[in-house]
UniProtKB/Swiss-Prot annotation:
Gene3D superfamilies: Anticodon-binding domain, Bira Bifunctional Protein, Domain 2, YbaK/aminoacyl-tRNA synthetase-associated domain. Its EC number is 6.1.1.15. It is found in: Cytoplasm. This is Proline--tRNA ligase. GO terms for molecular function: aminoacyl-tRNA deacylase activity; ATP binding; catalytic activity, acting on a protein; proline-tRNA ligase activity; transferase activity. GO terms for biological process: prolyl-tRNA aminoacylation. GO terms for cellular component: cytosol. The gene is proS. It catalyses: tRNA(Pro) + L-proline + ATP = L-prolyl-tRNA(Pro) + AMP + diphosphate.
Length: 618
């Protein structure tokens, strides 16, 4: 395909509003353009990459018996009222009315639609299982769209739904999807982890997230590609290396989520769901009597601990939340942080939010900084992290401004429900006892859920079982963020290309090393001088030969400076560059492997044979 015929509007500079490298490079390399806040046009290069990813998905889903279809994006609100999500989904839901004043939404997900279709068509367990999916644009009214395709108001998603007559059958399909997702993301060239996830607004029972890891850009060997003009990193002057390090560090590490994973096992979880190894301890010290002490001007745990000369681990942090309009007291060891997802899940609450200071005063009789679990009103619900029960003679707020109590002992001085509600810390033992927890940032690219009967119960989707009884259909849900795959791939495969000019100056610029399976084209064929007829003829022959061998070829036939062509080639990021230059009359061309920066001159007649050898090596 001729580059002059494509819309590839590359830019000479990075866009000023981009904070993450994937957003900057997608815009600069001419892959996307923003039409409105959080709404993007996918230009030819991006569209080709997305279509290649769709092909990978379709091939893997066919292996597990998943069937593609297409549902409408414009949905009646009545379906969402049936499930209860019309009221609970929140402000992100696009709501609109037609000319008859009927309520509609733009679908962010399609559980209700697929449930209704199957409910109306399937009557017997003999018609199950069903495994359906679609690839479609979704809509979410994000309050603050950001980071390019990672947080948008319109996005492309693959959402699949499976329908079963029992949970055992669901388990089989769930495992099929887990393996299919691993195959898809592996083929896409992603470094990813399957982690324990939160069902969130989907209402799932069990769930697993697939996170593309976005590591810090500190390893020069990984992130920097040297041109053939530079033998090794050691040849680069120290001051230039420092500039390169600064450029790598200048771009924010993307990823909405923090992942906690074990250094020695397969355990991995979203930080919201991560736990650690917990061992109850036996109390050995005698229990002191409660004593009220004045703690003037002490509002925080560290201030109280310093004032009383105790360790923060000997204090109790007391928080008040409102869960579905009911007050709930949450307790933590002083140096721990609350994990509101764990608390919300434990309470099975639809809404959970921190109480205001006015609400805290009404409940405790004191303001923030002096709250505690002792002598609360009878019937008060207290949920404490499991570590709290190991404390002896702890310090807690006295529910009196400017005062705390010492000698607080769980069980004697207050009763609580003990459960894991804390945020894990890096370096703690993995819950399986193997290795310690490390953190990484990640981009969620896929999520699978065991929905169970969440939607079939609320929407009356039943079948007749083996005994002729009406039972709810058991469901699974399986999503992949198709458009954000482009961001994830670029985040992982962006590179800083460094070269040395004939004058001895060092220059560096960002580009992409697209993995072969997702690159919009396989080969970038560049004619240095389009006015040279010999070069033109050789280019045409090579394009035809490569295409005949199954390569997708992008031919740069533009009448541009060679430096501009090479810069655009680095930006676009195709795996192989073939240059027809000054030696065209001799039948000599240059091959450059983008991933390594390695280049070689070959006879044009041996080009395809050489490419087959080189691509096997890389």
């Amino acid at each position: 395909m001729k580059q002059s015929k494509l819309l590839i509007p590359t830019l000479r500079e990075m866009p000023s509003d981009a904070q993450v490298i994937s957003h900057a490079l997608m815009v600069r390399a001419g892959y996307v353009r923003q039409v409105s806040a959080g709404i993007y046009a996918y230009l030819p290069l991006a569209n080709r990459t997305i279509e290649k990813f769709k092909t990978i998905m379709r091939e893997e889903f066919e292996k597990i018996g998943a069937v593609e279809m297409l549902a409408p994006a414009l949905l009646t609100a009545d379906l969402w009222r049936e499930s209860g999500r019309y009221e609970t989904y929140g402000e992100d839901l696009y709501k609109l009315k037609n000319r008859d004043n009927s309520d509609f939404i733009l679908g962010p997900t399609h559980e209700e639609t697929f449930t209704t279709l199957v409910r109306d068509a399937v009557k017997s367990y003999k018609q199950l299982p069903l495994n359906l999916y679609q690839i479609q644009s979704k809509y979410r009214d994000e309050k603050r769209p950001r980071n390019g395709l990672l947080r948008t108001r319109e996005f492309i998603m693959k959402d699949g739904y499976s329908f079963h007559h029992n949970y055992e059958d669901l388990d089989v399909t769930y495992e099929d999807y887990r393996q299919a997702y691993e195959a898809i993301f592996t083929r896409a060239g992603l470094d990813f982890k399957g982690i324990i996830g939160d069902g969130g607004a989907m209402g799932g029972k069990d769930s697993q997230e697939f996170m593309a890891i976005t590591p810090a850009r500190t390893d020069l060997d990984r992130w920097v590609v040297l041109d053939k003009s530079i033998a090794s990193m050691d040849d680069i002057p120290k001051e230039v290396l420092e500039e390169i390090k600064a450029e790598l560090a200048a771009w924010m590490i993307s990823g909405e989520d923090t992942i906690a994973y074990s250094t020695e096992s397969s355990y991995a979880a979203n930080l919201e769901m991560a736990t650690n190894e917990y061992k109850p301890s036996s109390k050995v010290a005698a229990e002191d009597a409660l004593a009220e002490v004045e703690t003037p001007h002490c509002k925080t745990i560290d201030e109280v601990a310093a004032f009383l000369s105790v360790d923060e681990t000997q204090t109790i942090k007391t928080l008040l939340f409102v869960a579905d309009n009911e007050p709930v007291v949450a307790l933590l060891v002083g140096n721990d942080h609350i994990n509101t997802v764990k608390l919300k899940n434990y309470l099975a609450a639809d809404f959970l939010e921190p109480a205001s200071e006015e609400e805290a005063r009404a409940f405790f009789g004191a303001g923030f900084g002096s709250l505690g679990p002792v002598n609360l009103a009878q019937g008060s619900r207290i949920v404490a992290d499991r570590k709290v029960q190991n404390l002896t003679n702890a310090v807690a707020g006295a529910n009196k401004d400017g005062f705390h109590v010492t000698g607080v002992n769980p069980g004697r001085d207050f009763q609580a429900e003990y459960v894991d509600i804390r945020e894990v810390k890096e370096g703690e033992m993995s819950p399986d006892g193997h290795g310690v927890l490390q953190f990484a940032r990640g981009i969620e690219v896929g999520h699978i859920f065991k929905l169970g009967t969440r939607y079939s119960d609320s929407m009356g989707a039943t079948i007749l079982d083996e005994n002729g009884r009406a039972v709810p259909i058991v469901m699974g849900c399986y999503g992949i963020g198709v458009s954000r795959i482009l961001s994830a791939v670029i985040e992982q495969h962006a590179r800083l290309f460094v070269n040395k000019t004939p004058k001895g100056d060092y220059r560096y610029a960002w580009g992409v090393n697209f993995p072969k399976e997702l690159a919009p084209f396989d080969v970038h064929l560049i004619t240095v001088n389009v006015k040279d007829q010999v070069a033109q003829d050789l280019t045409a022959k090579l394009e035809a030969d490569l295409t005949a061998k199954g390569y997708d070829v992008l031919t740069d036939d533009r009448n541009e400076r060679v430096g501009s062509k090479f810069s655009d080639s680095d930006l676009i990021g195709l795996p192989i560059r073939v240059t027809v230059g000054k030696k065209a009359a001799e039948g000599i061309v240059e091959i450059k492997i983008k991933a390594t920066g390695a280049s070689i001159e070959v006879n044009a007649e041996n080009l395809i044979e050489t490419l087959e050898i080189l691509t096997k090596e890389h």
